[in-house]
């Protein structure tokens, strides 16, 4: 479905040109139109939080930790969730701020135990201005860093987010 969203359709790519008639093609991407309208409609108003217990401190904490996130975060998250059926949010700390990165299912994979708890999360990525593929593996204690051949390129870093849980959420 992601290919269709990007405009790579079978109808256009496998089109047989015929010289005895007009070959004008109308390429209207209704899937992209539908998803973009769904995202715009769902997120037209700012997301607000309320506490069932009436605890304003929790609401203030949520707003404090998410105020520096990208303005497009919620729309990108919903768009990828609609396209793939689910996606991931990876949480990390940078410059003493809680950050989040959206990971598409084409770039990451998780493994659950029989109770539905996430045990591992694998993420494949490229660094800026490099063609090499890197893999990070997250578990409850460490983050392991590998190259595309699963050769360790750095010592594991301590996973100190989420109190002993894998730092992802599945959306």
Task: Locate each region found by the language model.
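Extended, helix-rich architectural segments
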Residues: 1-99
């Amino acid at each position: 479905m992601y290919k269709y969203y990007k405009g790579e359709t079978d109808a256009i790519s496998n089109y047989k040109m015929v010289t005895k008639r007009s070959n004008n093609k109308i390429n209207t991407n209704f899937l992209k139109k539908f998803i973009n309208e769904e995202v715009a409609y769902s997120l037209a108003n700012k997301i607000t939080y309320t506490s069932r217990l009436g605890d304003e401190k929790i609401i203030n904490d949520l707003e404090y930790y998410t105020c520096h996130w990208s303005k497009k975060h919620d729309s990108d998250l919903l768009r990828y969730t609609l396209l793939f059926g689910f996606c991931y949010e990876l949480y990390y700390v940078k410059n003493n701020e809680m950050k989040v990165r959206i990971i598409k299912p084409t770039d990451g994979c998780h493994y659950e135990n029989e109770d539905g708890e996430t045990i591992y999360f694998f993420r494949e990525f490229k660094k800026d201005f490099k063609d090499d593929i890197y893999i990070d593996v997250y578990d409850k204690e460490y983050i392991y860093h590998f190259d595309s051949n699963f050769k360790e390129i750095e010592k594991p870093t301590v996973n100190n987010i989420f109190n002993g849980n894998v730092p992802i959420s599945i959306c």
